Amino acid sequence: FLPATRATPKELLPIYDTPALQFVIDEAAQAGCTRVVIVTSRAKPSIENYASAASTDKVAVSVVYQDSPLGLGHAVTCAHQAVGNEPFLVLLPDEIMGDASLTKQLIALYEKSGKSSIGLKRVAVAEVSNYGNVKVASGASDASSTDSSVAILQVVEKPKPADAVSDIVIIGRYVLSPKVFEKLEQIKPSSNGELQLTDALAMLASENALVGVVSEITRYDTGTPMGLLRAVIEIALERKDIGPQLNSWLKEKFNK
C-alpha cells in the first residue's frame, strides 16, 4: 500500500469514508462488547489518537503496544493484562465482515460449549496455503449447510495444497478462552521468529477444546490492494448517500 502507508497506517486506510479499524470497532460493539483493546506499534501514534476519539458511551477503546512485530500469537499475548482471565474476541482489521452475525454466532457457540470458537470458511484447496487450515470432526467437513458449527481436530499453519487437511480455513474472527494464554507461553517461535496463534489453537484442538463456525458471510480481505478496492466499491454501493450515483456511473462506464 505504499506510498499511502507512509502517511497513514494500513488499519486507518478508508473504506470509502470509514477507516478499516472503525468497521472492527463497530462490529465488536454490535456483538455486545463494551471494551475494545487495539494492539498496535508505538510507530503508529495516529492509531492511538484514533482510539481516543473512537470511544463512545457504549464502547471504550484503548491501546496496548506490541514493541516488535512477532506474530499474531505475540500480539494476543500483549493484550493479556488488559484482557485478564476472561474470554475475549480477536478481530483482525484487515478482514472486514459484511455484518456482526459471525461474531455473534461465535460468542453463542463459546457460551454453549465453553470452548474457544473460531471463524471458518471453505476455499479451493489451491488457496489453503494463504490461511490456517483445519481438520474437523468426521462428517462435518462434508456438510453443505450454511454457517454450521464443527469440532476442530487439527490446525495447520498455511500448508501446501498437497498437505491440506481439508478445504476449511480460518478467517480473522475468534472467541478465545483465557486458556489460550497458557498455550501461547508453551509454544516455540516459528522459523521467522514469530509466535503463531495457530500453534496455540493446535494445542487446544488436540485437547478437544476448539470449535468453529463454517460461514458464508460476506468478507473483504483489505490486506491486499484488490481486496481493499473491492471493499470500497461494494460498501459504497450499499450506501444510500452515494450508492445510486456510483451504480449509475459504473453502468455507464462499463456499458460503453
List where the protein language model places each region.
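Conserved N-terminal catalytic core of the sugar/cofactor nucleotidyltransferase
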Residues: L13-P14, T18-V90, I96-S101
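Cofactor-binding loop segments of dinucleotide-utilizing enzymes, especially the Rossmann-like FAD-
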Residues: T40-S41, P93, K121-R122, S215
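Conserved alpha/beta core of the MobA/IspD/sugar-nucleotide pyrophosphorylase nucleotidyltransferase superfamily
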Residues: V136, S148-A151, V165-K256
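Structural beta-sheet core signal
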Residues: I38, V90, I118-G119, G212
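Generic secondary-structure signature for well-ordered alpha-helical cores
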Residues: Q30, S52, Q81-G84, A108-K115, ...
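Conserved core of the sugar-phosphate nucleotidyltransferase
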Residues: G98-K183, I187, S191
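Short N-terminal binding/cap micro-motifs at the start of the first secondary-structure element
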Residues: F1-P3, S46
